[in-house]
């Protein structure tokens, strides 16, 4: 007997795949045209990157165009001509051309930073566009570094921009960072934070660090003057299950814009010696109440493994191993459960879905409202961890034969929930869905929305 529902799902999936391929082809052709135009203009970033690590001869005079363009900041008493010249001769590396890196780069280029390095391994996606303001719809599929470079050169064609379209790691970090004066950590990634911190300490480069999640943001400067480094504050990385990125926790685009702009400001202050740099202090921004807090953080740790007088770490290490997590925010799956405690979405669809069971969706209510599987019940992870779900499901939990299936967006929070419930009810059949709703869309129902 023909399964019309399955055929319709496959038809929709094929149409979506064809549309995606056509859109990707159009994007690639547009990228090719733009890159060929850049090469023809003598601005090929790969050639620039391989040519030399030496920056051009310092400029000692502002041009008439410089004076006209930067006049509003030239007339600032503490900035002036000398400040503009320092900025013109400066070189800044931005690691991560996402929600933080885009506004930071935009303001640095607009202010007249002479040399900018952009590093990002990733390509532009539609889900980036609400906060990564240098990218555009027609550049989806293009390298983020190249996409940002195109937008920045439209803003200021006098800025020299190098693209590093690769993942920064222990093998290439020292070589990439060495020619730059200041580094901006816009990665929002724990393993990369430790990598950049250690490399910048070893190379004596100030590190302007920003982060943003949900409605909150933070900003500080590490390794500046006698201030602490990142390891002084966080000598031990957090457990992987305690880390949330904007892909899982969400973020409001304007929050990343605020923090990224402030990172640019701190970089400018470091370069020209302006004001009181945010070293030894942490700026905390709460977007929901629009409150800024400026708090003191600890001083340099005398026994810091990297920045102390006798460091234990004198060369870069394997930071993914050290942190127990990948150096990207792309599909970082947790591995908390044994294979027999997990359930593939196809197996669930084919066998268990038609049988009595309890399907608990542990996403927050806002995410559950976006989309949900039939018969699923929303029980946020927080309710499971504080055991407030027990009273609600007391009757079902009395039945040890009733299978309990945990579900989330990507299969991480569901593992945490399954582990917690299993510890409390070891005799019950408790499993989570591998890959969560993303896997459901990819393997079962192509019409199910992805976010």
From Swiss-Prot:
Keywords: ATP-binding, Cytoplasm, Metal-binding, Molybdenum cofactor biosynthesis, Multifunctional enzyme, Nucleotide-binding, Nucleotidyltransferase, Phosphoprotein, Transferase, tRNA processing, Zinc. Residues 43-52 have a biased composition (Acidic residues). Binds 1 zinc ion per subunit. GO terms for molecular function: ATP binding; metal ion binding; molybdopterin-synthase adenylyltransferase activity; molybdopterin-synthase sulfurtransferase activity; thiosulfate-cyanide sulfurtransferase activity; URM1 activating enzyme activity. Plays a central role in 2-thiolation of mcm(5)S(2)U at tRNA wobble positions of cytosolic tRNA(Lys), tRNA(Glu) and tRNA(Gln). Also essential during biosynthesis of the molybdenum cofactor. Acts by mediating the C-terminal thiocarboxylation of sulfur carriers URM1 and MOCS2A. Its N-terminus first activates URM1 and MOCS2A as acyl-adenylates (-COAMP), then the persulfide sulfur on the catalytic cysteine is transferred to URM1 and MOCS2A to form thiocarboxylation (-COSH) of their C-terminus. It is found in: Cytoplasm, Cytosol. Its cofactor is Zn(2+). Zn(2+) binds at residues 229, 232, 304, 307. Coiled coil: none annotated. It comes from Drosophila persimilis (Fruit fly). Residues 42-62 are annotated as: Disordered. The modification Phosphothreonine is found at residue 60. Pathway: tRNA modification; 5-methoxycarbonylmethyl-2-thiouridine-tRNA biosynthesis; Cofactor biosynthesis; molybdopterin biosynthesis. This is Adenylyltransferase and sulfurtransferase MOCS3. The keyword Nucleotide-binding applies. Residues 353-449 form the Rhodanese domain.
């Amino acid at each position: 007997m023909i399964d019309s529902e399955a055929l319709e799902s496959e038809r929709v999936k094929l149409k979506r795949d064809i549309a995606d391929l056509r859109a990707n082809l159009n994007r690639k052709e547009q990228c090719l045209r733009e890159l060929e135009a850049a090469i023809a203009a003598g601005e090929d970033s790969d050639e620039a990157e391989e040519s030399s690590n030496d920056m051009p001869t310092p400029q000692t005079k502002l041009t008439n165009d410089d004076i006209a363009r930067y006049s509003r900041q030239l007339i600032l008493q503490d900035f002036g001509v000398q400040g503009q010249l320092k900025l013109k001769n400066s070189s800044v590396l931005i690691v991560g051309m996402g929600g933080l890196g885009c506004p930071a780069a935009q303001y640095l280029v607009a202010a007249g930073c002479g040399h900018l390095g952009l590093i990002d391994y990733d390509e532009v996606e539609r889900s980036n566009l609400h906060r990564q303001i240098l990218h555009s719809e027609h550049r989806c599929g293009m390298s983020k570094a190249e996409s940002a470079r195109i937008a920045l050169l439209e803003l200021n064609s006098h800025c020299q921009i190098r693209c590093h379209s690769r993942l920064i790691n222990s093998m290439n970090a020292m070589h990439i960072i060495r020619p730059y004066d200041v580094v901006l950590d816009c990665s929002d990634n724990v393993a990369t934070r430790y990598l950049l911190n250690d490399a910048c300490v070893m190379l004596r480069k100030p590190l302007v660090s920003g982060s943003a999640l949900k409605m909150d943001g933070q900003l500080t400067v590490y390794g500046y003057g006698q201030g602490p480094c990142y390891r002084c504050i966080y000598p031990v990385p957090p457990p992987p299950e305690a880390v949330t990125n904007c892909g899982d926790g969400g973020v409001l685009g304007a929050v990343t814009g605020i923090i990224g702009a402030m990172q640019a400001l701190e970089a400018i202050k470091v370069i020209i010696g302006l004001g009181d740099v945010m070293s030894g202090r942490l700026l905390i921004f709460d977007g929901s109440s629009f409150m800024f807090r400026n708090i003191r953080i600890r001083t340099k740790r005398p026994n810091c493994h990297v920045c102390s007088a006798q460091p234990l770490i004198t060369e870069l290490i394997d930071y993914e191993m050290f942190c127990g997590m990948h150096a990207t925010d792309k599909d970082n799956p947790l591995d908390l459960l044994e294979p027999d405690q997990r359930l593939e979405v196809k197996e669930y669809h084919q066998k268990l879905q038609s049988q009595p069971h309890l399907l608990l969706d542990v996403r927050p209510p806002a995410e559950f409202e976006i989309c949900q599987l039939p018969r699923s019940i929303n029980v946020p992870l927080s309710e499971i961890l504080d055991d407030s779900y027990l009273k609600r499901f007391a009757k079902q939990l009395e039945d040890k034969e009733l299978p309990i299936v945990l579900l989330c967006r990507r299969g991480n929070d569901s593992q945490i929930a399954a582990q917690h419930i299993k510890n409390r009810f070891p005799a019950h059949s408790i499993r989570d869905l591998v890959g969560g709703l993303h896997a459901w869309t990819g393997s079962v129902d192509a019409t199910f929305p992805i976010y």
